[in-house]
Amino acid sequence: MKHLLKMSDLTPGEVTHILDVADQLKAQQKLGGTAPLLAGKTVAMLFSKASTRTRTSFEVGVYQMGGLGNYINTSELQAGRGEPLKDTARVLGRYYDCVVWRTYRQRDLEEFAALAGVPVINGLTDYAHPCQVLADLMTIRERRGTLAGRKLCFVGDGGSMANSLIVGGLLAGMQVTCVCPEAYRPAADVLMLAHKYGSAFHFTSDPVEGVRDADVVATAVWNTAAPGTAESEQRLRDFVGFQLTGKLLEAAKPDAMVLHCLPAHRGEEISTAVFEQHADEIFDEAENRLHVQKAVLAILLAGK
């Protein structure tokens, strides 16, 4: 593994290895602290978008492993005044051992990684959110023991979370169902890849059909438009019936897990009652962002 840009860059063995290392690092932290695996290492954390979990978990993780992490708002860089991305990549690659970037466009991240000369980690783009999906898989494995053969259902917008969870679940040997309105399907290349797994993948626009007998049901915010705007109102209409409610989850297994990458818009993609009923799972998932990201850093920078 040279970078972590999207889930399809990984092999099934690499996914398992990341989760195994994350388990080890989490156990060590609970016992008093992680070994200084990043001593003498520097990590740039570039953010072009607001963040709570990604920023803080990377900052804490780098600190816990003895490294130096620098948070950088990209609006403060010369790139915000017209310096070419390729120049920024080649400069930061001379200063830092690794770069984490949360940005808008996946193609910018890919270009940056091709030129930086150091490992680059995707902190969220319009196409992929691999760190979050690794945390999801870690949480499922912690609570259910195994991933292979379990039914994972994603309900929501076919954006970065859907793209990444589909691929991540399939790499882990899960049966994956994606439930989206037809106008909000995942990326075409993700669907093409997923269908190569045959009966292990299913796409539907029927939420009840999708969650039927699911072991795990995941969702994410699907209305990011400003409240009251035409786009927001259109999305509210388009996603009628796609909210995770107690009624919808009656079709899933009685002990089904519910995951949400946060932040949550209660009353839109998930009801308040369902969120609170599954809060322990959801906040374990949030905590595990820290541990899987530490694992990725340890693998990329310390040869774990």
Label every model-predicted segment:
Residues 1-56, 60:
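Positively charged, low-complexity intrinsically disordered leader regions
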Residues 48-60, 142-220:
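Glycine-rich phosphate/diphosphate-binding loop of Rossmann-like nucleotide-binding domains
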Residues 65, 95, 115-117, 172, ...:
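Short, structured coil segments at secondary-structure junctions
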Residues 42-43, 47-95:
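Active-site cofactor/substrate anionic-group-binding motifs, chiefly glycine-
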Residues 255-256, 261-304:
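Adenosine-phosphate binding glycine-rich loop
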Residues 195-273:
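Rossmann-like adenosine-cofactor binding region
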Residues 90, 97-168, 260:
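Anion-binding alpha/beta catalytic cores of soluble intermediary-metabolism enzymes, centered on
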